[in-house]
Amino acid sequence: MSDDELLQGPIEMLRNGDLDGAIADLDAKMGQHKKNAQVHHMFAEFANMKNMEAQDDVIPGGKIMMAYKKAMQLDEENEEYIADFATFALECRRIPVAVKEFQRYAKKLELNDIPTDEVLFNASRNIVDALEVMDLSLIHI
């Protein structure tokens, strides 16, 4: 079964408004297709979408983070996976992780002669916004 065929079911479920079904299907597929980066990445994206929609951690953030990391581990050359993980880390207010991953993403773009993109522009703005709302008195230097 090709990757496109494997992911067709969850994509159709999402199109039909069944995000929960798509996530459940991808969760099962992660166990069956442990070495398929696209399955792990799509699960992380859909699960994050679910949490954003619910404005709550319906799906544990740690599980989402592990799915992103697994996708990156399986396909180290995929810049999209790095950018998506960095964005997720920033959404979770894990600023040091986000900064590290955005730096790695920028380096990959540079090595591939790809100009700096909108992802990095938005990241810099969102990092500044996140720092502005943090209680910096809690940070010990």
Predicted regions and their residues:
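Conserved small/polar residues in nucleotide/adenosyl-binding loops
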Residues: 139-141
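Structural signature of tandem alpha-helical TPR/SEL1-like repeats
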Residues: 17-24, 52-67, 92-104, 134-136
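Canonical positions in the second alpha-helix
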Residues: 29, 70-71, 105
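Alpha-helical segment of the N-proximal tetratricopeptide repeat
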Residues: 4-28, 32, 48-53
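TPR alpha-solenoid repeat register
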Residues: 39, 81, 115-116
